[in-house]
Amino acid sequence: AGESSTSDQMRQRLAAGAWPPVLVFAEGTTSNGSGILEFRTGAFVAAAPVLAVSLRYASPSGFDLCWTDQASTPRHAMRMLCEPSKVALIALAPLHHPTKAEAAVPSEYAAAVRRTMAKNLPQPPEGLTGRTTRTLWDGWDYAKVRAFWAAENENYERQNAS
């Protein structure tokens, strides 16, 4: 017996009702957060219902912890650890059952779920920003992050002064 494709394995698991449920990041990568990339269709071949979860990160300094821009893992980890506060914004869409047309053409099903997620993408609350169009690490504003960090430390010290 040969190896089955990931799509085949996913279809078998979904048909069996196995627990835990299948979690798929349909973009297959991370981006700068300015939009939703085209979905890979393998996750939609099984034509199973999809609970679309939209995720966006925000922070007062504008640092985007999911956008790595091909930087090294240690450098990205250091930047993430130095960010004093982070917020994960999560939005759940209603369960999407594929239409007959979507079930027959996985790329159409993927596109429909992608459109739903784009409409449902959470927006950062006032005072918090998600990374928008900056795509280079060199564009990261170190001075802004340092100033934010200093202000946070001052607030902490003021609140915890004896």
Where do the protein language model's features map onto the residues?
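Catalytic core of membrane glycerolipid acyltransferases/transacylases, capturing the structured
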Residues: 1-4
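A cross-family acyltransferase "interaction/gating" segment
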Residues: 20-21, 28, 32-108, 119, ...
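Short amphipathic alpha-helix with an adjacent loop that forms part of the alpha/beta core around
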Residues: 7-17
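Intrinsically disordered, low-complexity terminal tails
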Residues: 143, 147-161
